[in-house]
């Protein structure tokens, strides 16, 4: 039994395709949008269409941008000697919020994952290698601390070290405010590995 007209069912289906949106949330979003004034719905739809039509990947780092190169790559105040390697453009946004890093970025657009059928040629590693020249002093690998992220980090280290680049990995460990008793063995081991002198 259908509760809604086909157009509403279709909109619910489309919202449910978004990450983290289940059928109930998609239904709430649909009903919310349908109750908005027509002008606001048109503004929302136009913003989606415009973003999809104008946003592209930076030819240097692979970040989202509306001009090429992106604002980070074209900023003369950024440290051009350091590249932070991340999995996705959203990771750049996360790193930038911290305001501790002032270098360049490189987006892999994925990780090495044999289980998912992704090898080194399926992510932006060739582009990373081509960026390593005499100017690059350090490559910081900031992939996620999971099996795929670790495998990708190890592979990057293996291919870049012969090129003379210093390859480092961001530290992983106990979150601020976390209790040791709730930390798993792998997290605690990583925290010990990444310890610093105080």
UniProtKB/Swiss-Prot annotation:
<feature type="zinc finger region" description="C4-type">
    <location>
        <begin position="58"/>
        <end position="73"/>
    </location>
</feature>
<keyword id="KW-0862">Zinc</keyword>
<dbReference type="InterPro" id="IPR023627">
    <property type="entry name" value="Rcmb_RecR"/>
</dbReference>
<dbReference type="Pfam" id="PF13662">
    <property type="entry name" value="Toprim_4"/>
</dbReference>
<keyword id="KW-0227">DNA damage</keyword>
<dbReference type="GO" id="GO:0003677">
    <property type="term" value="F:DNA binding"/>
</dbReference>
<comment type="function">
    <text>May play a role in DNA repair. It seems to be involved in an RecBC-independent recombinational process of DNA repair. It may act with RecF and RecO.</text>
</comment>
<dbReference type="InterPro" id="IPR015967">
    <property type="entry name" value="Rcmb_RecR_Znf"/>
</dbReference>
<keyword id="KW-0479">Metal-binding</keyword>
<keyword id="KW-0234">DNA repair</keyword>
<dbReference type="Pfam" id="PF21176">
    <property type="entry name" value="RecR_HhH"/>
</dbReference>
<protein>
    <recommendedName>
        <fullName>Recombination protein RecR</fullName>
    </recommendedName>
</protein>
<dbReference type="InterPro" id="IPR006171">
    <property type="entry name" value="TOPRIM_dom"/>
</dbReference>
<dbReference type="Pfam" id="PF21175">
    <property type="entry name" value="RecR_C"/>
</dbReference>
<feature type="domain" description="Toprim">
    <location>
        <begin position="81"/>
        <end position="175"/>
    </location>
</feature>
<dbReference type="GO" id="GO:0008270">
    <property type="term" value="F:zinc ion binding"/>
</dbReference>
<dbReference type="Pfam" id="PF02132">
    <property type="entry name" value="RecR_ZnF"/>
</dbReference>
<keyword id="KW-0863">Zinc-finger</keyword>
<dbReference type="GO" id="GO:0006310">
    <property type="term" value="P:DNA recombination"/>
</dbReference>
<keyword id="KW-0233">DNA recombination</keyword>
<dbReference type="InterPro" id="IPR034137">
    <property type="entry name" value="TOPRIM_RecR"/>
</dbReference>
<comment type="similarity">
    <text>Belongs to the RecR family.</text>
</comment>
<dbReference type="InterPro" id="IPR000093">
    <property type="entry name" value="DNA_Rcmb_RecR"/>
</dbReference>
<dbReference type="GO" id="GO:0006281">
    <property type="term" value="P:DNA repair"/>
</dbReference>
């Amino acid at each position: 039994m259908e509760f809604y007209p086909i157009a509403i069912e279709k909109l619910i289906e489309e919202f449910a395709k978004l990450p983290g949106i289940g059928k109930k949330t998609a239904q709430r979003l649909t009903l919310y949008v349908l109750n908005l004034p027509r002008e606001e719905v048109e503004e929302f739809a136009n913003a989606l269409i415009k973003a999809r039509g104008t946003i592209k990947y930076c030819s240097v780092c692979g970040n989202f941008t509306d001009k090429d190169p992106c604002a980070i790559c074209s900023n003369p105040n950024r440290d051009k000697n350091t590249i932070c390697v991340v999995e996705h453009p959203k990771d750049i946004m996360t790193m930038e919020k911290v305001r501790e890093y002032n270098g360049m970025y490189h987006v892999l657009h994925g990780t090495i994952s044999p289980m998912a059928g992704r090898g080194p040629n399926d992510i932006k590693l060739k582009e990373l290698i081509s960026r390593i020249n005499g100017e690059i002093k350090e490559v910081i690998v900031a992939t996620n601390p999971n099996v795929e992220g670790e495998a990708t980090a190890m592979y990057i280290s293996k291919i870049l070290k012969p090129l003379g680049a210093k390859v480092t990995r961001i530290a992983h460990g106990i979150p601020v405010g976390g209790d040791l008793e709730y930390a798993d063995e792998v997290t605690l081991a990583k925290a010990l590995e990444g310890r610093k002198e105080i």
